[in-house]
Design a protein with these regions (language model features):
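Residue-level signature of catalytic and energy-coupling elements of molecular machines
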Residues: 10, 43, 67
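Conserved acidic
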Residues: 2, 59-66
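Short, charged/polar low-complexity linear motifs in solvent-exposed/disordered segments
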Residues: 54, 64-65, 80-81
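Stable alpha-helical structural segments in soluble proteins, enriched in small hydrophobic residues
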Residues: 66, 70-78
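N-terminal intrinsically disordered, cationic/polar leader segments
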Residues: 25-49
């Protein structure tokens, strides 16, 4: 196989993968669903939903912990999804500069 053709195919695959990752919408929750977040493939927080039951002066610290946990879980899920997509594309190989 022509090395130049292979490089072009890899570049096209990389571009497709980056487009797929950009459209990811990952949801995660904490506190039994009391706090839910949606994060995109670049780990930007897109939405945050908080059950009104956890919003009170006495529960602020718990709410902060739940939000932190939900955001961290969403980031972990984004990483996991990206690794699955890359693994399928590259057959498990680590390709420098793919993301």
């Amino acid at each position: 196989m022509n090395p130049q053709k292979l490089m072009n195919q890899l570049k096209q695959a990389q571009e497709r993968m980056q487009q797929e990752i950009a459209t990811l919408q990952i949801e995660a929750a904490s506190g039994g669903g009391m706090v839910k977040v949606v994060m995109d493939g670049q780990k930007n927080l897109k939405s945050l939903r908080i059950d009104p039951e956890v919003v009170s002066k006495e529960e602020v610290e718990m709410l902060q912990d739940l939000v932190t946990a939900a955001v961290n879980e969403a980031a972990r899920k984004v990483d996991e999804e990206i690794q699955e997509k890359i693994g399928g594309l590259a057959g498990g190989m680590k390709i420098p500069g793919l993301l």
